[in-house]
Amino acid sequence: MMMHSRNRSWTLTLLALGVVLATSAEDLPRSNRIAVPGEPLYYLMADAGPVVTPNEALKRTNRSLLKWWDDLFPRNNNNCCNNNNNNLLYPTAPLLPAPAVPNNCNGLQLQDLDPFKQMKLFKKLPELFPTASPCGQCGGGCGQNNYVAPAPQSPSYGGDGYGVLPNGGYIKPDTEYNGPGDGDAGYVAPAAPAYEAPAPPAPAYEAPAPPAPAYEAPAPAAPAYEAPAPAAPAYEAPTTDYSAPAPPAPAYEPPASSYTQGYSQPAQPSYVGAPPAQIVYQPIIYLSTPLASKSSTSQVEYDDQKYVTPTAPPPPPPPAPVYEAPSQNCYQPAAPPAPNYATPSCQTPIRLSLIDQPYRVAPELFEEYNYRLALASQNIL
């Protein structure tokens, strides 16, 4: 009983640990915490956002480059009075103790090779002739708040040109002016109906319309082209003349009666040309064998089932030897030595053929070689 309770407690403990691990693993990717600079997820999400439109592509690229560059090369604290920020209540602490670099105090930090940041600093250039002090933007007081509020505007009119107008700044509008711009007060636009004067020439352009009926005058010329139509009956006249050769057709009908007789030679018709082709009637002879008896049929079926071993034809007689060994003794003049081997004169010389050669050789060379071998075997060469 105690063992069962211990097993149950261990099982419950393992299940609880599994649930805790599963929930913690699920919470990791579901976290909405924004990654801070320095973490890999920060730079990855800068260029891969789920709700980023294509129009934001360049902005995202610039943002990732700026953040990466700023984190890689942090600013020093000597860039013109804390980066032109005179905040005395919450001064920013230096990120890293960077070595002092020459600062020309013109808004361009030349030690930063970031093109995007350079373009942003270009818009913050100081005046053309700054005050002669180590920090131009601060006026020399780097640790003081040197902001001076501008004096209130005086109500005087004229002088500096910034005062309030004596009539309270109200300008009475000109009711008759309806032109564009401030410098065209005397401009009066021409009346729109005056531009409609060129409209009457439009009916004057319709005058060329009457020549259109004059172009219809050639229409009566069409009946003049129909005059050749009566010539069509004149072409039908040859048809009546051509009907005359029709009577000779019955002259060819007499040979038809000759076919009723015993296939006799038909009378040749009287017409110019080659005689008609003769029709040769070839008799068809059907050959048949007498019906075989049942015993012979069964014998034939039984013979078909036997396997007759074919007898091999007798081997052909061996061909007569082309080369006859010389009857002389072996003491013959020795042949010149071959490059690799020497064949004794008593043995059969080597015969070469096209099959023995790995390369293509002219057949005439083999014929000449074999011919000289034959002569040498007879001591003629």
UniProtKB/Swiss-Prot annotation:
Entry annotated with the keyword Repeat: yes
Main location: secreted
Sequence segments annotated as region (Disordered): 236-270, 309-329
Biased composition range(s): Pro residues: 311-321
The record's account of how the chain is modified after translation: Sulfated by pip; may be involved in embryo dorsal-ventral axis determination. Sulfation by pip may occur on covalently bound glycosaminoglycans. May undergo both disulfide and non-disulfide cross-linking upon incorporation into the vitelline membrane.
Phenotypic consequence of gene deletion: Females produce eggs with normal chorion morphology but that are fragile with increased chance of collapse after oviposition. Embryos within these eggs fail to cellularize. Follicle cell microvilli involved in vitelline membrane biogenesis are disorganized and vitelline membrane biogenesis is disrupted.
Keyword field: Disulfide bond, Extracellular matrix, Repeat, Secreted, Signal
GO term, biological process aspect, one: vitelline membrane formation involved in chorion-containing eggshell formation
Sequence repeat placement: 190-199, 200-209, 210-219, 220-229, 230-239, 247-256
Subcellular locations according to the entry: Secreted; Secreted, Extracellular space, Extracellular matrix
Signal peptide: 1-25
Tissue specificity statement from the Swiss-Prot or TrEMBL entry: Present in the perivitelline space of stage 10 egg chambers and in the vitelline membrane adjacent to the oocyte in stage 13 and 14 egg chambers (at protein level).
GO (cellular component) term, any one: extracellular region
Domain of life: Eukaryota
UniProt-annotated stretches for the region 6 X 10 AA approximate tandem repeats of P-[AP]-A-P-A-Y-E-[AP]-P-[AT]: 190-256
Note from the entry: The name 'palisade' was given because of the disruption of the palisade-like arrangement of vitelline bodies and follicle cell microvilli within the perivitelline space during vitelline membrane secretion.
Function: Minor protein component of the vitelline membrane. Involved in vitelline membrane biogenesis during late stages of oogenesis. Required for efficient disulfide and non-disulfide cross-linking of several vitelline membrane components.
Protein name, as recorded: Protein palisade
